[in-house]
Design a protein with these regions (language model features):
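Bacterial N-terminal signal peptides
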Residues: 6-15
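Positively charged n-region of N-terminal signal peptides that target proteins for export
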Residues: 1-4
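Alpha/propeptide regions of enzymes that mature by internal proteolysis
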Residues: 20-386
């Protein structure tokens, strides 16, 4: 059995993490489980994240509110060193390229890129171009690439049909990827995103789990959150959406009548897992999403990807390869960690976001920190840091 570590066992680690902006735990939102030092996907050794944020008011009156987020499973070696991976669509009104080959091969080759719906193509092409420039030279003449690029729609706040994401932004996101703290909220691919009718965006979290055989494993999650209606919103089990009903999106369009947004969830772990096991992990991300009050509506694109950085040697070309993996009866800790980290990553995205004036007069308010604390106290769920 793999067991989740208790939060008290690692308080010294996450106390050292950089936190320029308050995160959900800083506001007193209670979560189960112990985080890594950064409480981020980059707590998984080797994983790096790079982001480019595009915010500009154009002379035409249009507003650019978009960007690119890059997740590199093996850091600078990612372009030439695959990992085991799997994906799952809870509701498929969205796009994640490269998934047919992930299903077929069980491998994720290259970075995971997040952007807006109408920039998927340019980001995909730019990743291939970057691999041609920076990867190992092709001596066979038969090299090919099927990059993984996922999207959510930021057209409420961003001039999405202005096609403002360009190849150089992809190169910048890949180049600036680091293993340090991950910026959250109005950044990268999440710059113009909205969830539960609050300003939202990028969020991340992690969990440490203990294996019976000794040592620890880490599960890290990063989300690009752009889904959900206000009333069903729950945070730490509290029906927050029913008490924070003001400050909804100002829009010149008719209000949404159902859940039509999307969320991309990326789960990373250093636990040795095979592709079919990672498929099970990817599915568990949906349970963390459900904790927030999502019901994966017909118009929502809820697409999840999981990968393991273990078994690097088995990725090398060989007639026969060997890989280690966590036993079937020992996966529950990884499942639980995935659910917990997904929930916290989404709340972190909401807490980090700031009010945003967007395209065509649209305006999205961020969740009120004071209002959230007030509702948590009302239900006895306020847990200030000690």
């Amino acid at each position: 059995m793999i067991r989740l570590l208790t939060a008290t066992a690692l308080c010294a680690f996450f106390a050292s993490a950089s936190a320029a902006e308050p995160r959900a735990r800083d506001l007193g939102v209670p979560f189960e489980g112990a985080t890594g030092a950064l409480n981020a996907i980059t707590d998984v050794a080797g994983v790096t994240v790079g982001q480019v944020t595009l915010i500009e008011d154009l002379a035409s009156g249009k507003k650019v509110r978009t960007g690119v987020t890059a997740i590199l499973p093996r850091g600078k070696q990612t372009l030439d060193a695959p990992v085991f991976g799997a994906w799952f669509a809870l509701n498929g009104n969205g796009e994640m390229t490269g998934t047919a080959w992930i299903d077929e091969s069980g491998q994720l080759e290259g970075p995971v890129m997040l952007t807006n719906t109408h920039s998927v193509g340019v980001v995909r092409d730019a990743v291939i171009a970057e691999r041609v420039r920076s990867g190992v030279a092709d001596t066979s003449g038969y090299w090919w690439s099927l990059p993984v690029v996922a999207e959510t729609w930021d057209g409420e706040l961003n001039d999405i049909n202005g096609f403002h994401v360009r190849p150089e932004h992809v190169s910048q996101a890949l180049a600036n990827a680091s293993s340090g703290p991950v910026a959250e909220g109005n950044v990268g691919g999440g710059t113009g995103m909205i969830c539960h009718e609050f300003k939202c965006g990028i969020g991340t979290a992690s969990r440490l789990i203990k294996a019976d055989a000794g040592g620890n494993y880490t599960v890290g999650v990063l989300v690009q959150a752009n889904y959900g209606m206000r009333d069903p919103l729950r945070i730490a089990g509290v029906p927050v959406g029913q008490y924070l009903r003001n400050d909804r999106i100002y829009s010149t369009a008719a209000p949404a009548q159902g859940e039509t947004g999307s969320i991309i969830i990326v789960v990373a772990t250093d636990a040795p897992l095979l592709p079919h096991q990672l498929k099970r992990i990817a599915k568990r991300a949906g349970m963390g999403l459900a904790r927030m009050g999502s019901y994966a509506g017909n118009g929502s694109g809820d697409i999840f990807l999981a990968f393991s950085t273990a078994n690097a040697a088995s990725m090398k070309e060989a007639a026969v390869s060997q890989a280690s993996f966590v036993g079937l009866e020992h996966l529950d800790g990884v499942f639980e960690a995935t659910v917990q980290a997904t929930e916290e990553a989404i709340v972190n995205a909401m807490v980090a976001a700031r009010d945003m004036q967007g395209n065509d007069g649209h305006y999205a308010k961020a969740i009120s920190h004071a209002g959230l604390v007030k509702v948590l106290k009302r239900f006895g769920r306020y847990a200030p840091r000690k």
